[in-house]
């Protein structure tokens, strides 16, 4: 019980009035203020300095200081509890009046004390001015309220508690008592401190001897206190407004006057608008109407309203308004602006008069309730009006209100009694067995309602929805319309007045100014106080039909209702601003008649011009038309200023004026301090505990943790756990600190005006020094060092990387502009220089291409590189670091070998010593026991065995030495062939040398010293002499080649300039001879590894293996027999040769024979599709030499524009990279096509049983989708257009199917056969060929298709029913077939090839515009059709040209595609003709063709150049529209970073000359996202486009939502290609059945298409992961319901399957989404495989086969 009583007593004591009063009293006493500091000064210094003046004067000053301190505290305490005093002392004007004189007096007092000196009697203490000043000093400091720890919150809490507390006297007494005790406590503490100081003699002596004797210290101490007081007072003066009174609400009147002027201008221009009447609150803000022009208001309000009387009468001669105190201490705070609330609708913004913190009482439900959001103006008005209301009226109102309250209280008591009785009855009925029906509880709530009081004591109440007192001003919505009173009236109104809002909007008066506002009132707005109307209408005139829909807020439109006495209306006027403020963006967005100025301030910015369309036009006009008038030039300049595209650059500094209304008072920031150069977030010292400490000591902190935590306190575990968090925090702090420093540096350059000019010139000097002096000198020094160290120099690689480095001029914020053009006003605004692909000096270049992380950087003034502007310089990779790493590796290897050798040596010595001791012991035993009888059967067999072992050991050592010498001879012979095998041979020799040391004893080593000496000499010869000879030969060859290049280049240029049409044949032969010499030297240098293996196609390698002789195979054998190769690698190589059929396993162990063609044929016959006839083999062998010549010539060409990704990471030779001759682009596509073609056909050569074609599948077995790989390979594709897509070894991460649209022009629809006949019942030896049926008949050959190339057909070879398509599996009969080499796999993913074939046969199956998005081609445009026809004609003509014509045509304006085709075709034609025909015929034919074709080209080029000149302007504007329209979206933190990266890249590409190279590099490095950027089909001029559309550069993000359902619909449409929109031809189905050999389709199964088989290898992993984890989120994607439903319905209606089949198919399609094993898919697709074709080997089919019904 005692515990419970104590538990209940404690809250009562804590919440009691006495305890709360004591708490607030102590808090007011303990608030630290500057007066405490000066009190300590007075108590401390006066005792020491005034000893000579006497004790009485000392005590007087002390008493004056304490009394001033206590009096100031007491007045501040009273001001908390007394409102007028708090208002007087807490307002800014009070501080202005009190603080300024005090500061002046204190300043003069500390500076010149003779100012107050005068002759007076010192004995009279009243006249002593110092005592009064001490008292005034401590007293005034308290009144100024300059608190270090603010107490404004404390004052508010005290006032709230005073309002709520009942026993106020007890609260005041307790708080005063606590305050008094607190003051005494503070004074006693000061006294104790002073006494303790006096007792300490050391402190007292130092203070007296050193400080007080020095007069400078006393002066300095007084200055410190004075300056401290001055700073604190200035801090308080920061919230003081200017003491000059101005007119109230001057900014409102200015804005209204500006609005009226604008309306007058519009009326003068002929715009029919009415002047909008200013809507004002009738009950609030009387004084705000002083400067406004009042307008007439309708007389529809209550005549007896007091508020209306107060509005009509102006209060004059009010003493409190004229008084000075009222002017200074106005509680309404004149010139205080209201925050503008922007309204997006057409109406003016509402005046929100609610306050967050102001509270007052109001009467509701018979009680005084506290409102914390009471209107300030209403309470102020009540305070002003109370003194003017007579006392009798107040008593009468109170009596009436009490009488009403009594009735309300009586009803509530009655209701509570009823509820109590009902509750007791329910409790009693719970125990009864049967429940008794209880009466319903009727709870009545009585609240104040709004009603209309008539004289007949009848009150008409409003409904609850329309009553603002019940629902509040922001809760109810009123539907503006008619209230039907009865049925007849409603029917009559429906006939006479159209209730439909659309009809009403049409019939409204559109000439008035507020027509837009009338239209907007029909929309529902949440923050709108709507009116209500109750009236009876009897309209007979048709003219008034349009004026029935009433808006009660717009009172000026209701004047017509006064004519009718039957209309009664009750309305509430909403306070609105009479003007609409606009921002700067809204001012720009006006299409016609923009306003002169904006009203809301925007952020300060600097405009940077990015694109000027009229810049070039003005320069050309100035050259040609120099005689024009000056007026026209000025007009053009003004128009060009408007057409410029400008980006606003915002300075990186805080801007507190953003969003404020002009001519308004700024926010009152009372306790805000700005102590830094750049302070983004200004806040009060109240939040000091939440700030990060500026002065941190990380080293001392870490030292303290290491010493105390581990050794003293033993809390190492807790500190170790916190290290992870501290590291993350340190990283975050470092980033913030670096960003802050960067911004400070940038702002520091803006402080001085000349600094930007100096910095700009320094940056330009640094770019010149870096590009022209420093980097070339480093390259020269590096290569000279390599030559001196007998290494091959790397001039070409270094110069290539140096040329790749580009310096781009950027704006001050880092926005790239161009390489040559400077930004406008860059001297004053600043400039940045961005370096793309910065050069980094390397000791050697790696053989494998490495992706550099440093793609770009910025240049500093000191020539260093930084990642961000004004950032810290980054660490560049060291030149000597890789050299030192290699040396460290070698030293470590040598140490390891030395340790192993020492261990082996110790073991050998131990072994030899044991054998020696054993022999000696045996001899002693034999000598000592000679007389012992010999045991029969015992002989000295151990010695004989040892001798035999030693002999056998010597013989093995001799054989090994002989074998070593033979191998070393072979190594010396092949030394110049393979220079890079040196390390392997040396390692082999060292291993043999170690074996000899281990096995041979000490005596044997001495005997065999001659052999070791010979081996050592041979080693010196191989390592030093041969290497020097080889290096000299290489350097001389390089020098000779470089000189040859220069000579023949000069000859070639001379001949080309001399004869531009006819090229001399001798120069051509010379160049051919040079190429042969190059190939000969190159093959001699590198032998069989002469060319880059990465550039060879796999088809050529497979073909060359069986054609090579014994020597190459013997080299393979020697490689397999070497001891350095591990055994498991040998076995794998042998097994692979055995499986491929190149050689037998038995021959590998013995001697290899010459490989025959039969072995090659047997290997091909493993797959039945390669089982060819003898005639086909003969044709294949005949083309062998041509194929080999073409491939060799192809690889002799040097790679210039080929990307590093084409190497596929293969090993390169040292000299193969140093080639600079450009390779034709078409050869690259040949390689892609041949490699992909062979990879598809040979991917399953080892899995013979898995091949569908090589065997007959039994019934009931499913045919796998991936096994039937031949259907994915195009056999003969004749009608395709070659698009030059660069070869990319690594598949890109394609997320969306955005390729070119493919159009097929079908003249007549005829029966179309299938391309591939699949015979599943055939045996292994049966052959299945590719049947190339004539797919489309009766096609007009004169009209060219989009993807067609005219081919010179050979009727003898290309027969329609020929089956020789598989002969071209290596591309060796390309010349016979005369078809273009295409790469269809690059256009689509590998899995789309089969569907593409089906699409060509049946183009109506899949809508092409749904499957493949097309943004560049338009069928309706006739101009583009003519262009495509001209392109095709040019291509047909260019293929018949020779090599000389193609070189001449490269200088013309013809496009790049025709150039590459002509070069490729001409080279192949000329070489083949030279082999078959004689030289004379080729020369004559080429000359005749050249003369005829050049004239055609000149005519075509002239027509093309005219069209090109017309479209130059359009293409520039198209680039601008696509790339620069979204550049205004800078500064939005919610937007993605990838979008801004794309914009920066677009800015760079706009002014580059070679855009294609840079765009390809950006796309390959994935710096450029093609998904984000939009496209534009229509081309406009930029000024016209802006004028027509009225487009505004608004910083809004571009939101792109991926439509998941639409993507799924596309995939389903692809997967079900066997069904079409049209009726399926039955004959076509029968042919498929007969050809495929499928007698029973119901028993055969095929895998249904799974989503993972469609996308590319990288997209599969991402798509499968999204389906497994986020498939539920697809329900929220917005789709085109009309499109999806239409196509889906057509699909299912045309198919018409059974219900079960539909359900099974849907389950099968959705099966991956509901399997738990899909998590294994996520793990399975984590493998990173670059080749998408080989990725199918890793897939496992988890899905059940699906049966196809015919």
Curated annotation (Swiss-Prot):
<keyword id="KW-0150">Chloroplast</keyword>
<feature type="compositionally biased region" description="Basic and acidic residues">
    <location>
        <begin position="1420"/>
        <end position="1512"/>
    </location>
</feature>
<feature type="region of interest" description="Disordered">
    <location>
        <begin position="1205"/>
        <end position="1225"/>
    </location>
</feature>
<feature type="compositionally biased region" description="Low complexity">
    <location>
        <begin position="617"/>
        <end position="629"/>
    </location>
</feature>
<feature type="transmembrane region" description="Helical">
    <location>
        <begin position="177"/>
        <end position="197"/>
    </location>
</feature>
<feature type="transmembrane region" description="Helical">
    <location>
        <begin position="129"/>
        <end position="149"/>
    </location>
</feature>
<comment type="similarity">
    <text>Belongs to the TIC214 family.</text>
</comment>
<feature type="compositionally biased region" description="Basic and acidic residues">
    <location>
        <begin position="727"/>
        <end position="738"/>
    </location>
</feature>
<feature type="transmembrane region" description="Helical">
    <location>
        <begin position="216"/>
        <end position="236"/>
    </location>
</feature>
<keyword id="KW-1133">Transmembrane helix</keyword>
<feature type="region of interest" description="Disordered">
    <location>
        <begin position="1419"/>
        <end position="1512"/>
    </location>
</feature>
<keyword id="KW-0812">Transmembrane</keyword>
<comment type="function">
    <text>Involved in protein precursor import into chloroplasts. May be part of an intermediate translocation complex acting as a protein-conducting channel at the inner envelope.</text>
</comment>
<keyword id="KW-1001">Plastid inner membrane</keyword>
<dbReference type="InterPro" id="IPR008896">
    <property type="entry name" value="TIC214"/>
</dbReference>
<dbReference type="GO" id="GO:0009706">
    <property type="term" value="C:chloroplast inner membrane"/>
</dbReference>
<feature type="region of interest" description="Disordered">
    <location>
        <begin position="718"/>
        <end position="738"/>
    </location>
</feature>
<keyword id="KW-0813">Transport</keyword>
<keyword id="KW-0472">Membrane</keyword>
<feature type="compositionally biased region" description="Basic and acidic residues">
    <location>
        <begin position="260"/>
        <end position="277"/>
    </location>
</feature>
<comment type="subunit">
    <text>Part of the Tic complex.</text>
</comment>
<feature type="transmembrane region" description="Helical">
    <location>
        <begin position="69"/>
        <end position="89"/>
    </location>
</feature>
<feature type="region of interest" description="Disordered">
    <location>
        <begin position="617"/>
        <end position="638"/>
    </location>
</feature>
<feature type="transmembrane region" description="Helical">
    <location>
        <begin position="12"/>
        <end position="32"/>
    </location>
</feature>
<protein>
    <recommendedName>
        <fullName>Protein TIC 214</fullName>
    </recommendedName>
</protein>
<keyword id="KW-0653">Protein transport</keyword>
<dbReference type="GO" id="GO:0015031">
    <property type="term" value="P:protein transport"/>
</dbReference>
<feature type="region of interest" description="Disordered">
    <location>
        <begin position="260"/>
        <end position="282"/>
    </location>
</feature>
<keyword id="KW-0934">Plastid</keyword>
<feature type="transmembrane region" description="Helical">
    <location>
        <begin position="97"/>
        <end position="117"/>
    </location>
</feature>
<dbReference type="Pfam" id="PF05758">
    <property type="entry name" value="Ycf1"/>
</dbReference>
């Amino acid at each position: 019980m005692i515990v419970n009583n104590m538990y209940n007593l404690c809250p009562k004591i804590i919440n009691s009035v006495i305890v709360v009063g004591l708490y607030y009293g102590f808090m007011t006493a303990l608030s630290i203020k500057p007066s405490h500091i000066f009190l300590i000064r007075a108590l401390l210094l006066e005792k020491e300095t005034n000893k000579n003046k006497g004790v009485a004067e000392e005590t007087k000053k002390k008493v004056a200081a304490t009394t001033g301190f206590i009096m100031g505290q007491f007045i501040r305490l009273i001001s908390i509890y007394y409102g007028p005093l708090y208002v007087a002392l807490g307002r800014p004007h009070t501080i202005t009046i009190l603080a300024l004189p005090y500061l002046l007096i204190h300043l003069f007092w500390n500076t010149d004390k003779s100012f107050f000196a005068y002759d007076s009697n010192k004995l009279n203490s009243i006249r002593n001015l110092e005592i009064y000043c001490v008292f005034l000093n401590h007293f005034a400091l308290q009144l100024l309220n300059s608190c270090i720890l603010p107490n404004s919150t404390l004052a508010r809490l005290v006032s709230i508690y005073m309002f709520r507390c009942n026993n106020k006297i007890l609260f005041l007494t307790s708080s005063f008592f606590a305050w008094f005790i607190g003051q005494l406590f503070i004074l006693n503490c000061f006294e104790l401190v002073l006494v303790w100081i006096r007792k300490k003699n050391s402190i007292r002596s130092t203070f007296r001897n050193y400080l007080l004797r020095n007069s400078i210290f006393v002066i300095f101490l007084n200055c410190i206190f004075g300056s401290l007081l001055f700073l604190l007072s200035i801090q308080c003066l920061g919230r003081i407004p200017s003491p000059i009174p101005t007119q109230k609400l001057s900014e409102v009147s200015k804005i209204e006057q500006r609005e009226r002027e604008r309306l007058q201008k519009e009326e003068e221009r002929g715009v029919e608008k009415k002047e909008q009447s200013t809507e004002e609150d009738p009950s609030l803000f009387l004084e705000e109407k002083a400067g406004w022009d009042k307008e007439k208001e309708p007389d529809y309000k209550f005549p007896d309203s007091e508020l209306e009387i107060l509005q009509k009468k102006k209060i004059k001669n009010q003493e409190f308004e004229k008084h000075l105190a009222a002017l200074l201490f106005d509680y309404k705070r004149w010139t205080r602006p209201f925050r503008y609330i922007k309204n997006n609708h057409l109406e003016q913004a509402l005046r929100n008069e609610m306050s967050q913190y102001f509270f007052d009482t109001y009467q509701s439900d018979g009680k005084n309730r506290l409102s914390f959001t009471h209107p300030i103006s209403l309470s102020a008005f009540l305070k002003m009006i109370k003194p003017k209301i007579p006392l009798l009226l107040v008593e009468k109102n109170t009596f009436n209100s009490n009488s009403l309250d009594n009735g309300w209280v009586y009803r509530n008591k009655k209701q509570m009694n009823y509820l109590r009785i009902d509750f007791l009855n329910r409790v009693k009925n719970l125990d009864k067995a049967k429940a008794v029906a209880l009466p319903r509880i009727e709870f009545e709530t009585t609240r104040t309602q709004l009603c209309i009081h008539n004289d007949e004591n009848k009150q008409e109440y409003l409904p609850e929805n329309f009553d603002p007192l019940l629902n509040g001003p922001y809760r109810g919505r009123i539907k503006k319309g008619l209230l039907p009173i009865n049925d007849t009236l409603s029917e009559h109104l429906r006939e006479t007045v159209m209730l439909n809002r659309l009809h009403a909007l049409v019939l409204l008066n559109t000439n008035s100014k507020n027509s837009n506002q009338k239209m907007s009132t029909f929309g529902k707005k949440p923050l709108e106080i709507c009116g209500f109307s109750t009236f009876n209408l009897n309209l007979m005139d048709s003219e008034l039909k349009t004026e029935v829909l009433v808006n009660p807020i717009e009172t000026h439109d209701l004047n017509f209702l006064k004519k009718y006495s039957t209309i009664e209306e009750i309305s509430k006027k909403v306070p609105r601003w009479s003007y609409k403020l606009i921002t700067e963006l809204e001012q720009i967005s006006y299409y016609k008649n923009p306003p002169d100025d904006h009203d809301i301030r925007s952020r300060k910015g600097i405009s940077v011009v990015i694109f000027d369309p009229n810049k070039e036009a003005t320069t050309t006009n100035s050259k040609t038309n120099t005689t024009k008038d000056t007026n026209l030039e000025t007009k053009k300049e003004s128009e060009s200023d408007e057409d410029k595209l400008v980006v606003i650059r915002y300075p990186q500094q805080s801007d507190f004026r953003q969003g404020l209304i002009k001519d308004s008072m700024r926010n009152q920031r009372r306790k805000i301090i700005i102590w830094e150069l750049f302070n983004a977030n200004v806040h009060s010292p109240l939040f000091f505990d939440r700030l990060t400490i500026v002065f941190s000591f990380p080293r001392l902190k870490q030292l303290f943790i290491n010493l105390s935590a581990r050794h003293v306190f033993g809390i190492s575990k807790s500190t170790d756990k916190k290290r992870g968090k501290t590291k993350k925090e340190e990283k975050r702090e470092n980033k913030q600190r670096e960003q802050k420093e960067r911004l400070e540096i940038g702002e520091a350059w803006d402080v001085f005006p000349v600094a930007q000019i100096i910095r700009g010139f320094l940056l330009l000097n640094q770019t010149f020094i870096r590009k022209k002096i420093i980097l070339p000198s480093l390259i020269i020094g590096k290569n000279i060092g390599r030559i001196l160290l007998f290494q091959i120099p790397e001039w070409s690689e270094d110069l290539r990387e140096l040329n790749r480095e580009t310096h781009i001029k950027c704006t001050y914020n880092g926005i790239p502009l161009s390489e040559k053009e400077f930004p406008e006003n860059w001297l004053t605004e600043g400039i940045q220089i961005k370096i793309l692909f910065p050069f980094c000096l390397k000791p050697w270049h790696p053989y494998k291409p490495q992706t550099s992380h440093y793609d770009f950087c910025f240049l500093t003034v000191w020539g260093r590189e930084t990642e961000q502007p004004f950032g810290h310089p980054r660490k560049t990779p060291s030149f000597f670091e890789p050299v030192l790493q290699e040396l460290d590796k070698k030293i470590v290897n040598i140490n390891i070998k030395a340790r192993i050798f020492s261990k082996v040596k110790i073991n050998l010595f131990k072994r030899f010593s044991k054998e020696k001791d054993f022999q000696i012991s045996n001899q002693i035993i034999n000598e000592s026991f000679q007389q012992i009888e010999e045991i029969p059967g015992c002989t000295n067999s151990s010695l004989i065995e040892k001798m035999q072992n030693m002999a056998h050991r010597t013989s093995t050592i001799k054989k090994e030495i002989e074998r070593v010498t033979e191998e070393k001879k072979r190594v010396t012979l092949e030394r110049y062939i393979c220079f890079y095998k040196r390390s392997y041979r040396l390692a082999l020799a060292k291993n043999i040398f170690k074996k000899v040391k281990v096995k041979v004893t000490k005596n044997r080593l001495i005997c065999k010293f001659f052999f070791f000496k010979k081996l050592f000499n041979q080693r010196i010869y191989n390592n030093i002499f041969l290497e020097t000879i080889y290096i000299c030969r290489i350097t001389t060859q390089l020098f000779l080649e470089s000189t040859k290049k220069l000579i023949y280049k000069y000859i070639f240029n001379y001949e080309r300039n001399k004869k531009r049409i006819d090229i001399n044949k001798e120069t051509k032969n010379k160049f051919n001879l040079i190429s042969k010499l190059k190939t000969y030297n190159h093959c001699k240098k590198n032998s069989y590894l002469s060319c880059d293996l990465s550039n060879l196609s796999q088809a050529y390698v497979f073909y060359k293996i069986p054609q090579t002789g014994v020597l190459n195979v013997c080299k393979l054998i020697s490689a397999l027999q070497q001891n350095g190769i591990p055994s498991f690698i040998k076995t794998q190589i042998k097994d692979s040769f055995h499986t491929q059929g190149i050689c037998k396993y038995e021959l590998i162990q013995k001697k290899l024979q010459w490989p025959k063609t039969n072995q090659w044929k047997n290997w091909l016959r493993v797959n039945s599709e390669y089982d060819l006839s003898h005639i086909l083999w003969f044709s294949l062998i005949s083309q062998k030499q041509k194929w080999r010549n073409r491939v060799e010539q192809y690889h002799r060409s040097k790679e210039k524009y080929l990307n590093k990704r084409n190497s596929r990471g293969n090993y390169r030779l040292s000299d193969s990279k140093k080639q600079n001759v450009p390779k034709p682009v078409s050869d690259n596509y040949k390689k892609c096509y041949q490699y992909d073609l062979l990879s598809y056909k040979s991917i399953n050569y080892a899995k013979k049983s898995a091949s569908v074609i090589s065997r007959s599948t039994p019934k009931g077995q499913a045919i796998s989708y991936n096994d039937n790989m031949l259907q994915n390979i195009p056999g003969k594709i004749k009608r395709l257009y070659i698009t030059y897509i660069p070869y990319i070894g690594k598949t890109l991460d394609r997320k969306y199917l955005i390729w070119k649209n493919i159009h097929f022009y079908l003249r007549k629809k005829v029966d179309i056969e299938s391309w591939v006949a699949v015979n599943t019942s055939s045996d292994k030896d049966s052959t299945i060929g590719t049947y190339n049926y004539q797919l489309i008949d009766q096609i007009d050959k004169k009209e060219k298709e989009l993807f067609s190339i005219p081919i010179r057909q050979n009727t003898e070879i290309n027969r329609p029913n020929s089956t020789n398509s598989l002969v071209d599996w290596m591309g060796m009969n390309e010349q016979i077939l005369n078809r273009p080499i295409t790469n269809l796999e690059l256009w689509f993913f590998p899995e789309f090839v089969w569907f593409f074939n089906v699409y060509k046969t049946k183009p109506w199956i899949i809508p092409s515009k749904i499957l493949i998005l097309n943004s560049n081609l338009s069928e309706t445009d006739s101009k583009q059709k003519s262009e495509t026809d001209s392109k095709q004609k040019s291509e047909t003509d260019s293929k018949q040209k020779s090599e000389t014509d193609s070189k001449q045509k490269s200088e013309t304006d013809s496009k790049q595609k025709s150039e590459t085709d002509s070069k490729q075709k001409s080279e192949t034609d000329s070489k083949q003709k030279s082999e078959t025909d004689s030289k004379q015929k080729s020369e004559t034919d080429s000359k005749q063709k050249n003369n005829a074709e050049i004239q055609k080209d000149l005519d075509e080029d002239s027509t093309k150049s005219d069209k090109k000149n017309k479209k130059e302007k359009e293409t520039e504007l198209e680039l601008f529209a696509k790339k620069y329209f979204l550049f205004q979206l800078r500064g939005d933190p919610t937007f993605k970073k990838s979008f801004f990266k794309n914009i920066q890249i677009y800015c760079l590409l706009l002014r580059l000359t070679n855009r294609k190279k840079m765009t390809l590099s950006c796309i390959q490095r994935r710096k450029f996202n093609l998904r984000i950027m939009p496209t534009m089909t229509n081309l406009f001029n930029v000024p016209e486009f802006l004028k027509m559309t009225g487009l505004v550069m608004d910083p809004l993000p571009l939101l792109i939502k991926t439509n998941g359902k639409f993507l799924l619909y596309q995939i389903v449409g692809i997967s079900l290609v066997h069904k079409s929109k049209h009726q399926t031809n039955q004959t076509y189905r029968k042919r498929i059945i007969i050809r495929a050999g499928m007698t029973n389709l119901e028993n055969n199964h095929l895998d249904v298409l799974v989503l993972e088989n469609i996308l590319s290898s990288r997209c599969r992993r991402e798509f499968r992961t999204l389906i497994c984890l986020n498939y539920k989120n697809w329900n929220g994607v917005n789709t085109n319901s009309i499109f999806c439903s239409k196509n889906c319905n057509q699909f299912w209606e045309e198919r018409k399957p059974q219900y079960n089949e539909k359900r099974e198919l849907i389950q099968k399609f959705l099966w991956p989404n509901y399997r738990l094993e899909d998590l294994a898919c996520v793990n399975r697709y984590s493998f990173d495989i670059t080749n998408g074709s080989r990725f199918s080997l890793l897939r496992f089919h988890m899905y059940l086969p699906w049966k196809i019904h015919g």
